[in-house]
From Swiss-Prot:
It comes from the Eukaryota. Residues 6-40, 41-76 form the EF-hand domain. Ca(2+) 2 binds at D54, D56, D58, E65. Keywords: Allergen, Calcium, Metal-binding, Repeat. This is Polcalcin Nic t 1. It comes from Nicotiana tabacum (Common tobacco). InterPro entries: EF-hand-dom_pair (IPR011992), EF_Hand_1_Ca_BS (IPR018247), EF_hand_dom (IPR002048), EF_hand_pair_protein_CML-like (IPR039647). Disulfide bonds: none annotated. GO terms for molecular function: calcium ion binding; enzyme regulator activity. GO terms for cellular component: cytoplasm. The lineage of its organism: Eukaryota, Viridiplantae, Streptophyta, Embryophyta, Tracheophyta. It holds the Pfam family EF-hand_7.
Amino acid sequence: MAEDPQDIADRERIFKRFDLNGDGKISSAELGETLKMLGSVTSEEVQHMMAELDTDGDGFISYEEFEEFARANRGLIKDVAKVF
């Protein structure tokens, strides 16, 4: 089954909003800054999210890692897309 083009566009837009410096990956600082814009988040919560999303353990969330998470959590991504 082909993916919905809107889902792909939403993922790309959301990733770019988190990738503040445009280097193609999301650092824990970028993740924390963007989440704080959405509401209160603790540094522990940011670290927990990084650990969950950074599956290769390099300290960054690549687009591929983000895409894998987004595909597994479509409902959450649709909610986030409404905010962004």
